[in-house]
């Protein structure tokens, strides 16, 4: 088997390693294809279908994120058929899901002249915002597009916790904790890596959620500072998002050689202790029931 193959991307020859995906070839050609469920560090679920391309001789459009490229393949990334398919996917998403916090989808909607009002009235199962689940992040499934990134990040690709899974079919499809148990009774370790990969704001850190609710979240005003987490000796790289001299969010650069963008509960959410935590968080930590549901390693201890 040859080490490299050559195919055509929009009429241009491109050489890539054998086993590369069509998306890899598109990137090598310097072209762009839209994606929603794709993440370079996660297994492609081929769920969103917005990255589909047309392959000469193929009856159906194929997902470029997971389809393996073949020698001699001729690929069209922006044919009329491809554009119609992408437009339809975006219209269906925007007609049934709140995408107001998903600028990527809005940008694609403008690019493909999507008209979601054509499908007005349809809606996915909108599970409620579960503010009482935990004090670290909020789940708002009315914004969920079922990209499955959170499931992949929680599973064997990153965390190996397997607290999240996909459940239901059709309009009943949703992300579940497994038998719909409360989050505190699931294997969740509150690392927040599901939050980090969510493209729509369906999963959001509590500080950001509360600031958005209060109208004080101002991303253009925020500055970013890179540092190293001091909770242990691993040396994870942190990116502190600062607004009004307060840390409002912590992430990790995706190109960081230690984390690859993923953190543990202490690295992602431990910053609250720098500010003493919110009053509600302190009460929850001090409460008899909430303290037990707090992540291990961040529970408060009672003084004797």
Give the residues covered by each predicted segment.
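N-terminal export/assembly segments and adjacent metallocofactor-ligating motifs
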Residues: 2-19, 27, 55-57, 72-96, ...
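N-terminal cofactor/phosphate-binding cores enriched in small/glycine residues
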Residues: 13-71, 84-85
């Amino acid at each position: 088997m040859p080490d490299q193959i050559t195919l055509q991307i929009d009429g241009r020859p491109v050489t890539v390693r054998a086993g590369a995906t069509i998306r890899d070839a598109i990137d090598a050609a310097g072209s762009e294809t839209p994606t929603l469920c794709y993440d370079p560090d996660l297994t492609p679920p081929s769920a969103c279908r917005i990255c589909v391309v047309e392959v000469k001789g193929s009856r159906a459009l194929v997902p470029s994120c997971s389809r393996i490229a073949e020698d001699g393949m001729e690929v069209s990334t922006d044919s009329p058929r491809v554009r119609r398919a992408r437009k339809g996917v975006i219209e269906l998403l925007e007609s049934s899901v709140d995408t107001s916090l998903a600028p990527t989808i809005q940008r694609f909607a403008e690019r493909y002249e999507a008209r979601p009002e054509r499908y007005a009235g349809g809606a996915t199962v909108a599970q409620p915002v579960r503010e009482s689940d935990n004090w670290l992040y909020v789940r708002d499934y009315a914004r969920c597009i079922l990209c499955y990134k959170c499931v992949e990040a929680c599973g064997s690709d990153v965390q190996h916790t397997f607290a999240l899974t996909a459940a239901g079919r059709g309009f009943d499809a949703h992300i579940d904790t497994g038998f719909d148990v409360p989050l505190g009774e699931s294997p969740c370790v509150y690392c927040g890596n599901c939050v980090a990969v969510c493209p729509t704001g369906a999963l959001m850190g509590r500080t950001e959620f509360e600031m958005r609710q209060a109208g004080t979240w101002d991303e253009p005003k925020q500055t970013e500072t890179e540092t190293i987490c001091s909770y242990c000796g691993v040396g994870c790289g942190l990116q502190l998002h600062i607004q009004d001299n307060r840390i409002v969010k912590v992430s990790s650069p995706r190109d960081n050689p230690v984390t690859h963008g993923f953190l543990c509960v202490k690295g992602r959410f431990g910053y609250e202790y720098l500010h003493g935590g919110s009053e509600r968080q302190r009460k929850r930590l001090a409460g008899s029931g909430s303290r037990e549901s707090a992540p291990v390693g961040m529970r408060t201890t009672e003084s004797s």
